[in-house]
Amino acid sequence: MEDIALLAVSKTFGAARIRECYAAGQRAFGENYVQEALEKIAALAATPETDEIEWHMIGPIQSNKTRPIAEHFHWVHSIERDKIAQRLNDARPARLPPLNICIQVNVSGEASKSGIAPGTEVGLADSIASMPRLRLRGLMAIPEPTPDASLRRQRFARLREMQKNLIARGH
């Protein structure tokens, strides 16, 4: 069985609260506002006892924010465009390991949600695979909230099929 890691969404919480969570054993923190995250990253980088923090960008990415994301984050969970992936690749410092990438999928087809449409994942995955400073790690989806358990299972089953398709193609 593979390990499961908890990603604590730390947006809107300050560095002091993150430090408390870190002391309790939490290591992965998700942010979706770049400026807010950079302030926390800087504050916590000055503290040696928090040197194992893993920063995850979980929000939408604007082109003008790719450089700080590439320079300060370990993971990006919201890639939906080749242009953003390319900019992250180009901005990722060579001294850092490749940036871990998840392709965001709009499994429920909601107009208000970001993400690629199911069935279009191969092209973006192929493109990311050709970028040496990025490492494709998986797919990410946030389906619509629904009390219908069958519909929830359907959405995640579709995501699982997409994952199998990518694995079969060597991703």
Specify the residue positions occupied by each region the protein language model found.
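Conserved alpha/beta-domain cores
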Residues: M1-G170
